[in-house]
A protein has these predicted regions:
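Glycine-rich phosphate-binding loops of nucleotide-dependent enzymes
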Residues: 2-257
Protein backbone atom coordinates (compact mmCIF):
# COMPACT_ATOMS: atom_id res chain seq x y z
CA UNK A 1 0.00 0.00 0.00
CA UNK A 2 1.36 3.42 -0.99
CA UNK A 3 2.01 5.78 1.92
CA UNK A 4 0.08 9.07 1.95
CA UNK A 5 1.72 12.28 0.75
CA UNK A 6 3.18 14.38 3.56
CA UNK A 7 4.64 17.28 1.55
CA UNK A 8 3.52 18.47 -1.86
CA UNK A 9 5.53 21.10 -3.75
CA UNK A 10 3.76 22.42 -6.86
CA UNK A 11 5.27 24.78 -9.46
CA UNK A 12 7.45 26.37 -6.80
CA UNK A 13 9.40 29.40 -8.03
CA UNK A 14 11.71 31.79 -6.19
CA UNK A 15 13.09 34.90 -7.86
CA UNK A 16 15.52 37.50 -6.56
CA UNK A 17 15.12 40.55 -8.77
CA UNK A 18 15.93 39.34 -12.28
CA UNK A 19 17.46 36.05 -11.06
CA UNK A 20 15.31 32.93 -11.05
CA UNK A 21 16.74 30.63 -8.37
CA UNK A 22 13.90 28.09 -8.53
CA UNK A 23 11.71 27.64 -11.59
CA UNK A 24 8.35 25.83 -11.35
CA UNK A 25 9.66 22.87 -9.33
CA UNK A 26 7.18 20.15 -8.34
CA UNK A 27 7.64 16.99 -6.26
CA UNK A 28 6.06 15.04 -3.41
CA UNK A 29 7.36 13.34 -0.29
CA UNK A 30 5.43 10.43 1.18
CA UNK A 31 5.29 9.56 4.86
CA UNK A 32 8.20 7.41 5.99
CA UNK A 33 10.26 8.19 2.89
CA UNK A 34 13.87 9.34 2.65
CA UNK A 35 13.96 11.68 -0.34
CA UNK A 36 17.23 13.01 -1.71
CA UNK A 37 17.36 16.47 -3.32
CA UNK A 38 20.52 16.71 -5.40
CA UNK A 39 22.10 18.76 -8.16
CA UNK A 40 25.30 20.60 -9.08
CA UNK A 41 26.36 23.71 -7.16
CA UNK A 42 23.88 26.52 -7.75
CA UNK A 43 21.09 24.15 -8.78
CA UNK A 44 18.62 25.62 -6.26
CA UNK A 45 18.63 22.90 -3.60
CA UNK A 46 19.08 25.13 -0.54
CA UNK A 47 16.74 27.73 -2.04
CA UNK A 48 14.11 25.00 -2.22
CA UNK A 49 14.75 24.08 1.43
CA UNK A 50 14.48 27.74 2.40
CA UNK A 51 11.18 28.15 0.55
CA UNK A 52 9.74 25.06 2.24
CA UNK A 53 10.85 26.06 5.74
CA UNK A 54 9.84 29.72 5.57
CA UNK A 55 13.25 31.35 5.20
CA UNK A 56 12.22 32.58 1.73
CA UNK A 57 8.74 33.38 0.52
CA UNK A 58 7.94 31.70 -2.80
CA UNK A 59 7.41 34.00 -5.76
CA UNK A 60 4.92 31.52 -7.23
CA UNK A 61 3.61 28.02 -6.64
CA UNK A 62 2.53 26.27 -3.46
CA UNK A 63 3.84 24.13 -0.63
CA UNK A 64 1.27 21.95 1.16
CA UNK A 65 2.37 20.11 4.30
CA UNK A 66 0.15 17.46 5.85
CA UNK A 67 -2.91 19.08 4.29
CA UNK A 68 -1.98 22.64 5.30
CA UNK A 69 -0.89 25.26 2.76
CA UNK A 70 2.23 26.93 4.13
CA UNK A 71 1.89 30.07 2.02
CA UNK A 72 3.05 33.04 4.07
CA UNK A 73 3.36 31.25 7.38
CA UNK A 74 6.25 32.32 9.58
CA UNK A 75 9.16 30.05 10.35
CA UNK A 76 8.11 29.28 13.92
CA UNK A 77 4.62 28.40 12.69
CA UNK A 78 6.09 26.00 10.13
CA UNK A 79 8.19 24.42 12.89
CA UNK A 80 5.09 23.99 15.05
CA UNK A 81 3.30 22.32 12.13
CA UNK A 82 6.04 19.69 12.08
CA UNK A 83 8.95 20.67 9.80
CA UNK A 84 12.46 20.87 11.25
CA UNK A 85 15.78 21.47 9.53
CA UNK A 86 19.53 21.63 9.90
CA UNK A 87 21.76 24.04 7.97
CA UNK A 88 24.84 23.82 5.74
CA UNK A 89 26.67 26.04 8.21
CA UNK A 90 26.34 24.80 11.77
CA UNK A 91 24.10 27.07 13.85
CA UNK A 92 24.49 26.01 17.45
CA UNK A 93 24.67 28.18 20.55
CA UNK A 94 28.37 27.73 21.23
CA UNK A 95 28.39 28.89 24.86
CA UNK A 96 25.51 26.59 25.79
CA UNK A 97 26.00 22.93 26.59
CA UNK A 98 24.95 20.19 24.21
CA UNK A 99 22.04 19.38 26.53
CA UNK A 100 20.91 23.01 26.66
CA UNK A 101 20.98 23.27 22.87
CA UNK A 102 18.61 20.31 22.57
CA UNK A 103 16.35 21.60 25.37
CA UNK A 104 15.90 24.82 23.38
CA UNK A 105 14.54 22.72 20.52
CA UNK A 106 11.72 21.44 22.71
CA UNK A 107 10.34 24.99 23.11
CA UNK A 108 8.39 24.53 19.88
CA UNK A 109 6.06 22.15 21.75
CA UNK A 110 5.74 24.05 25.03
CA UNK A 111 2.29 25.40 25.89
CA UNK A 112 3.09 27.44 28.98
CA UNK A 113 2.30 31.16 28.66
CA UNK A 114 4.91 33.84 29.37
CA UNK A 115 3.27 34.72 32.73
CA UNK A 116 3.19 31.02 33.58
CA UNK A 117 6.90 30.72 32.87
CA UNK A 118 7.69 33.83 34.93
CA UNK A 119 5.92 32.50 38.01
CA UNK A 120 7.13 28.95 37.31
CA UNK A 121 3.66 27.45 37.27
CA UNK A 122 3.19 23.68 37.77
CA UNK A 123 2.74 23.28 34.00
CA UNK A 124 5.98 25.17 33.34
CA UNK A 125 7.94 23.06 35.83
CA UNK A 126 6.48 19.88 34.34
CA UNK A 127 7.39 20.96 30.81
CA UNK A 128 10.92 21.87 31.93
CA UNK A 129 11.38 18.42 33.45
CA UNK A 130 9.99 16.70 30.35
CA UNK A 131 12.23 18.83 28.11
CA UNK A 132 15.37 17.75 29.93
CA UNK A 133 14.31 14.10 29.84
CA UNK A 134 13.63 14.33 26.11
CA UNK A 135 16.94 16.10 25.46
CA UNK A 136 18.87 13.42 27.35
CA UNK A 137 17.11 10.70 25.35
CA UNK A 138 17.84 12.44 22.04
CA UNK A 139 21.53 12.88 22.86
CA UNK A 140 21.69 9.17 23.56
CA UNK A 141 19.81 8.47 20.32
CA UNK A 142 22.39 10.35 18.20
CA UNK A 143 25.33 8.78 20.05
CA UNK A 144 26.21 11.69 22.33
CA UNK A 145 25.06 10.47 25.72
CA UNK A 146 28.40 11.39 27.32
CA UNK A 147 28.64 14.87 25.78
CA UNK A 148 25.64 16.58 27.34
CA UNK A 149 27.54 18.88 29.70
CA UNK A 150 30.15 20.02 27.16
CA UNK A 151 29.84 23.42 25.53
CA UNK A 152 28.75 23.11 21.93
CA UNK A 153 31.72 25.14 20.67
CA UNK A 154 34.14 22.62 22.21
CA UNK A 155 32.61 19.56 20.56
CA UNK A 156 34.32 17.81 17.63
CA UNK A 157 32.90 18.80 14.25
CA UNK A 158 31.08 15.49 13.76
CA UNK A 159 29.40 15.78 17.14
CA UNK A 160 28.29 19.32 16.34
CA UNK A 161 26.54 17.97 13.24
CA UNK A 162 24.87 15.25 15.29
CA UNK A 163 23.85 17.81 17.90
CA UNK A 164 22.09 19.84 15.22
CA UNK A 165 20.11 16.75 14.25
CA UNK A 166 19.19 16.10 17.90
CA UNK A 167 18.03 19.70 18.33
CA UNK A 168 15.91 19.47 15.18
CA UNK A 169 14.33 16.22 16.41
CA UNK A 170 13.56 17.92 19.73
CA UNK A 171 10.96 20.08 17.96
CA UNK A 172 8.88 16.94 17.37
CA UNK A 173 8.87 17.06 13.56
CA UNK A 174 7.00 14.95 11.06
CA UNK A 175 9.49 16.00 8.36
CA UNK A 176 13.22 16.38 9.04
CA UNK A 177 15.14 18.42 6.43
CA UNK A 178 18.90 17.79 6.46
CA UNK A 179 21.05 20.27 4.51
CA UNK A 180 24.39 18.59 3.71
CA UNK A 181 24.68 16.72 7.03
CA UNK A 182 27.80 14.83 5.88
CA UNK A 183 29.79 17.94 4.90
CA UNK A 184 33.33 17.58 6.25
CA UNK A 185 32.83 13.99 7.41
CA UNK A 186 35.40 11.23 6.93
CA UNK A 187 34.26 7.84 5.52
CA UNK A 188 33.58 6.25 8.92
CA UNK A 189 31.54 9.28 10.04
CA UNK A 190 29.55 9.12 6.81
CA UNK A 191 28.79 5.44 7.36
CA UNK A 192 27.59 6.20 10.89
CA UNK A 193 25.42 9.04 9.55
CA UNK A 194 23.77 6.71 7.02
CA UNK A 195 22.92 4.34 9.88
CA UNK A 196 21.51 7.23 11.94
CA UNK A 197 19.33 8.51 9.08
CA UNK A 198 17.92 5.02 8.57
CA UNK A 199 17.14 4.68 12.27
CA UNK A 200 15.46 8.11 12.22
CA UNK A 201 13.23 6.90 9.39
CA UNK A 202 12.54 3.65 11.24
CA UNK A 203 11.37 5.73 14.22
CA UNK A 204 8.59 7.14 12.05
CA UNK A 205 10.14 10.33 10.71
CA UNK A 206 10.16 11.41 7.07
CA UNK A 207 13.48 12.78 5.79
CA UNK A 208 14.35 15.29 3.04
CA UNK A 209 18.08 15.24 2.38
CA UNK A 210 20.42 17.57 0.48
CA UNK A 211 23.85 16.03 0.06
CA UNK A 212 26.76 16.31 -2.40
CA UNK A 213 28.15 12.85 -1.66
CA UNK A 214 26.45 10.83 -4.38
CA UNK A 215 27.45 7.49 -2.91
CA UNK A 216 25.80 8.40 0.39
CA UNK A 217 22.66 9.64 -1.37
CA UNK A 218 22.37 6.50 -3.49
CA UNK A 219 22.90 4.34 -0.40
CA UNK A 220 20.38 5.90 1.98
CA UNK A 221 17.51 7.39 -0.06
CA UNK A 222 14.34 5.74 -1.30
CA UNK A 223 13.89 8.25 -4.11
CA UNK A 224 15.80 11.19 -5.58
CA UNK A 225 14.81 14.53 -7.14
CA UNK A 226 17.46 16.24 -9.28
CA UNK A 227 17.67 19.99 -9.88
CA UNK A 228 19.76 21.90 -12.41
CA UNK A 229 19.75 25.68 -12.82
CA UNK A 230 16.63 25.87 -10.63
CA UNK A 231 14.60 23.33 -12.61
CA UNK A 232 13.74 19.71 -11.90
CA UNK A 233 15.37 17.44 -14.48
CA UNK A 234 14.72 14.01 -12.93
CA UNK A 235 12.69 12.25 -10.23
CA UNK A 236 12.98 8.54 -9.53
CA UNK A 237 14.57 5.61 -7.73
CA UNK A 238 18.33 5.76 -7.06
CA UNK A 239 19.03 3.12 -9.73
CA UNK A 240 17.03 5.14 -12.27
CA UNK A 241 18.76 8.40 -11.38
CA UNK A 242 22.19 6.77 -11.66
CA UNK A 243 21.52 5.89 -15.31
CA UNK A 244 19.57 9.01 -16.31
CA UNK A 245 21.30 10.77 -19.26
CA UNK A 246 20.13 14.23 -18.13
CA UNK A 247 21.58 13.68 -14.66
CA UNK A 248 24.87 12.37 -16.04
CA UNK A 249 25.11 15.40 -18.33
CA UNK A 250 24.33 17.79 -15.45
CA UNK A 251 27.15 16.41 -13.32
CA UNK A 252 29.72 15.51 -15.96
CA UNK A 253 28.86 17.87 -18.80
CA UNK A 254 28.16 17.00 -22.41
CA UNK A 255 31.17 16.63 -24.73
CA UNK A 256 31.42 19.08 -27.61
CA UNK A 257 30.48 17.68 -31.03
Amino acid sequence: MTAPVLLSVTDLSVRFGGLTALDAVSFEIRRGEILGLIGPNGAGKTTCFNAITGVYRPTAGSVVFDGTTLGRRKRHEITQLGIARTFQNIRLWGEMTALENVVVGTDARHRTSVPGALIRSPRHRREEHEAVERAVALLEFVGMADRGEEKAKNLPYGDQRRLEIARALATGPKLLCLDEPAAGFNPSEKAALVDLIRVIRDRGYTVLLIEHDMRLVMDVTDRIVVLEFGRKIADGLPAEIREDPAVIAAYLGVPDD
